[in-house]
Amino acid sequence: LLEEKNAALCDVGSLGAVVPGSIDASGETVLDAHNLDFHNVPLRKLLQEQFPGIPVYIANDANGAALAELYKGAFTGCKTGVLLTLGTGLGGGIILNGKMFNGGMNHGVELGHAYLVDGGEPCTCGNHGCMEAYCAASALTREGRRAMQAHPESMLAEKTGSDPAKITPKLVTDCAKAGDPAATGC
C-alpha cells in the first residue's frame, strides 16, 4: 500500500486494523474471530512489532465501518447511527451520542451470533441457530448446494457440473437473477 501511494513508513501517522470478531476492552487482543480462526490473538502487539514506533489500533470491523461513517461518511454531523455489515458474517456498529457503543462486555453488536432458531443450522462460532448461519455468505453457499442437489436440472447444477465445491454466493445470486427456480429459493 505504501508503494502504491508513493509513501514511506515514516509518513504513516498510525495504523488501524479491523477484524470480524470480538476485541478485548483494552484494544489489544482479538478474543474471537471465528471466520479467521483467531482466538486470543494479541494482534496489536504483533502489528506493533512489525511497525515499531507507529501507534496501532484494532477494532471490530463493523465498529470500524461505523466510525468511518461518523468521521467521513453517512453519519457525519449525526450523534446516532446504526450500521449493519453482511458478507462472510453479519455484524453491526452503533454510534450513540457521537461515540462508539461497545456494550457491557466490549463486544459491541455481534448481531450475527444472536440466537434465532432453536437447534438450527451450525454457525462458525460453534453454536446452532445464530442469525449469521441464515443470512451470511456461507448460508447462501450452503443453501445453493442443497438446492443444486435437490434439483439436478437446475442452472446451478449446469453451471457447476453438479460440483458442490463450485457453488459460490455470487453464482447463486446470478442464477437467481437469471430466473433459476432452485436458486431463487435459497
Residues of each region from the PLM?
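Short glycine-rich anion-binding loops that position phosphate/pyrophosphate groups of nucleotides
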Residues: 20-23, 87-89
